[in-house]
């Protein structure tokens, strides 16, 4: 939160706004900057086509309530209404990019970490998020299968061990493969 005291820097590290004294003007007001990246240069028809396409994809996939997809597109959808006025569909109009432009389309050949072309970045980010989500789902399923059937399988924490009659729990005779062999306590050897 920016301070109202002059001389205090703003959170973005910018100098504080200049304050006009009474009777003094600072010149013409600067146009406000957009709070989001405007990839269509402010063209309302292209933005409408963009969000109609997202809506069609949601409906086609049956994912209207999918949290991961909502998070991926939330930064772009918040500044715009969710229901567009009736009219012609801009998605059927002329293309807003040159299909012959092949710049940056060799990103797959440049190896991991190369950024995709601007046109494919939303699709690339969606695909990456879908892969992460699928990996997490598989991990959760494998953990659930490893627990086996029974009441403990519905709980995320292991069941407590049964009570032992000895003061110390007995150590296993052998260790799992790849683990060091457990050491025996010298005092337990003397008690035998």
From Swiss-Prot:
Residues 8-19, 159-180 have a biased composition (Pro residues). It comes from the Eukaryota. Residues 1-37, 146-192 are annotated as: Disordered. This is Uncharacterized protein C8orf90. The gene is C8orf90.
